[in-house]
Design a protein with these regions (language model features):
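Juxtamembrane intracellular "pre-TM" segments in multi-pass secondary transporters
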Residues: 1-5, 195-231
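C-terminal ends and interior cores of transmembrane alpha-helices
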Residues: 80-102
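Helix-loop boundary and gating motifs at the non-cytosolic
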Residues: 2-54, 227-232, 236-255, 265
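Cytoplasmic helix-loop-helix junction between adjacent transmembrane helices
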Residues: 110-150
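Hydrophobic core of transmembrane alpha-helices in multi-pass small-molecule transporters
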Residues: 17, 85, 99-121
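Residue-level signature of mid-helix packing/kink "hotspots" within the transmembrane helices
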Residues: 52-60, 121, 154-155, 270-278
Length: 280
């Protein structure tokens, strides 16, 4: 890679890392947030589904918008949504709701996860940036950085929880503040350092071709190889997301593990992901 491409590669990697880092911090402490306002396990499940469903719905449209308007502005838009969503979540958790109706903080939690999910296309856009700057023969190696970023975010995010979370009184002030600050830092880094990787000529071409996003999406799935690959990813992410979400709740509620202890299991997941993805 040329020096400017190396810099863009580093910027995209850091953008992806920071994006997943906030989620990795929130994952082990979200069950405790829900239990502050509702004792039902189903409520936590619905909260997780809200985020994942919103992300599933919005990501294809965000990818198409990045073709039409460029990678950089769409990435900034997504990060802005994350800042808003995590800020609402932080306010909900840190505010004293003792004299309020219980449904209000629950509504804000769901609203926060919905906004964060709808704007959760940073990973998809960063992946597209990596595709833009890498040659076909080096694309697989470059895409390996995505797995490294996910693994490293799992490792660092849960390390933050292990170090800063307190086992008493559901005190997660420092991890929540860290999770809130990271998207702001990410926005600043992208705004000043991440260049546009899609040429203006291609952006203008995409603007004229962009008519019906749903039609364009279904056109992609007419390709047999892409259809099979998408199905494989779909099955994998159902298993992985279900495992990580259920595991944390199971460890904390059924085995009475502390948040720090359950975060340690995700640290191991992060280490393995770094080794496997980096090695491949």
């Amino acid at each position: 890679l040329k020096p400017n491409k190396k810099f863009t590669l580093l910027s995209a990697f850091i953008t992806l890392l920071n994006d997943r880092l906030s989620e990795s911090i929130l994952l082990p402490i979200l069950p405790s947030f829900v239990l502050l306002f509702d004792s039902k396990a189903s409520t936590y499940g619905l909260l997780s589904c809200t985020y994942q469903l919103a992300q599933f719905t919005a990501s294809p449209f965000i990818g198409l918008m990045s073709d039409r308007y460029g990678r950089r502005p769409v990435t900034l838009f997504c990060i802005t949504g994350s800042v808003i969503g995590i800020s609402i979540l932080s306010f909900t958790v840190l505010f004293n709701w003792s004299n309020s109706i219980a449904s209000i903080p629950l509504f804000l939690l769901f609203l926060a996860r919905l906004i964060d999910g709808l704007s959760g296309g940073t990973a998809a856009t960063a992946t597209t940036i990596l595709a833009d700057i890498s040659s076909p023969e080096k694309r697989a190696k470059t895409f390996g950085l995505i797995g490294v970023a996910f693994g490293l975010s799992f490792f660092l995010g849960n390390i933050f929880v292990v170090i800063f979370a307190r086992n008493t009184n559901n005190n997660f002030i420092i991890p929540v503040l860290i999770a809130s600050i990271i998207p702001i830092i990410n926005f600043i880094l992208v705004f000043f350092y991440l260049p546009e990787t899609k040429p203006n000529s291609e952006i203008n071409k995409s603007k004229t071709a962009f008519k019906n996003p749903l039609k364009a999406l279904f056109t992609v799935f007419k390709e047999e190889k892409i259809k099979k690959l998408s199905l494989a990813f779909f099955i994998y992410f159902i298993a992985f997301t279900g495992l990580t979400n259920i595991l944390i709740f199971f460890l904390q509620e059924s085995l009475n593990w502390t948040t720090k202890a359950s975060s340690g299991t995700l640290v191991v997941v992060g280490i393995i992901a770094i080794i496997v993805q980096g090695g491949l």
